């Protein structure tokens, strides 16, 4: 099901009790409305993820620090995609951006783009007094043929009440139809700066740190389930301990390729180990749980799921017959419960929330909406705990 904005933002004066009040700390609640015309597609979600990492289609041959900022997330398309509102320019224009730990660029539609959808909010450089041209260009292309390109510039960016000055932004002058049909206006990358399209560009998190806007180089991520009201929240410079239960487990990060890479030590179903260790990427910009082909096949067999020949699996629609999928990271285990194992319902047929990713493994939103993650860019490491009920 598809969800869209139905009312203006409402700013709260202070953080929740679990998150100490902080200068510029704000929360914004955004009610959601349901669009019954939307039909989720696991196949499309899988292909989008594989294209992002330039892989071929499978089968085709709390407490915060003194300074923090909070950005609420809209749960769009029934946990398919999450976006937050970011204000860019002076005076500011609000853009719906995909907060993506699997990439590092900040780009969005602009009035310079004739191919960008009119349904998108477009940033107009002529209307911002703090806009400055950069002179460089950028271009992104993916394995499925989708692409976007444009120019670099700098402007002020307001991220959850934290004002980043002279943030490098990428203005789209052209985008393919795959981007034009998306509800979001662009993307805000939260990966490491070694994978920015134009080398040497500082990411928004880099600038939050270097400009002293946050006193710790961390951000906490909570992706709400639609069954629990949807939404979600990013907190920059801290985290919200009311959003998780128990204590946080520290997991080291391998960022040698610019991603938030972790080692999954084991995978279990009902106490039975179904796979040994494998490396995976924590990616808020990927909907599904992608597993290496051999792991996906073993998980599917354990659930009695059938291979659809395109990387996805058909699975029983009866959640009472499904046991949680359990991953070991660091010294703890983290679950994907039975209700999250079903991604798409089509009559009597259900499509699983996990898929075969070739040699690629991604702990996407299917995992992240069940587990709170604090990303620490400086160490680097993450801390993970199960979300509170």
UniProtKB/Swiss-Prot annotation:
InterPro entries registered for this protein in UniProt: Aspartic_peptidase_A1 (IPR001461), Aspartic_peptidase_AS (IPR001969), PEPTIDASE_A1 (IPR033121), Peptidase_aspartic_dom_sf (IPR021109)
Keyword Acetylation: no
One Pfam family hit: Asp
Residue span(s) of domain Peptidase A1: 82-385
GO BP, one annotated term: proteolysis
Gene3D superfamilies with a match to the protein in the record: Acid Proteases (2.40.70.10)
Disulphide bonds in the chain: 113-116, 317-350
E.C. number: 3.4.23.21
Catalytic activity: Hydrolysis of proteins with broad specificity similar to that of pepsin A, preferring hydrophobic residues at P1 and P1'. Clots milk and activates trypsinogen. Does not cleave 4-Gln-|-His-5, but does cleave 10-His-|-Leu-11 and 12-Val-|-Glu-13 in B chain of insulin
Propeptide residue span(s): 22-66
Active site residues per record: 100, 283
GO molecular function per UniProt: aspartic-type endopeptidase activity
Signal peptide annotation: 1-21
Keyword annotations from UniProtKB, A to Z: Aspartyl protease, Disulfide bond, Hydrolase, Protease, Signal, Zymogen
Top-level EC class: hydrolase
Family: Belongs to the peptidase A1 family.
UniProt cross-references to PANTHER family, sorted A to Z: ASPARTYL PROTEINASE, BETA-SITE APP-CLEAVING ENZYME, ISOFORM A-RELATED
Protein name per Swiss-Prot or TrEMBL: Rhizopuspepsin-1
Species: Rhizopus niveus
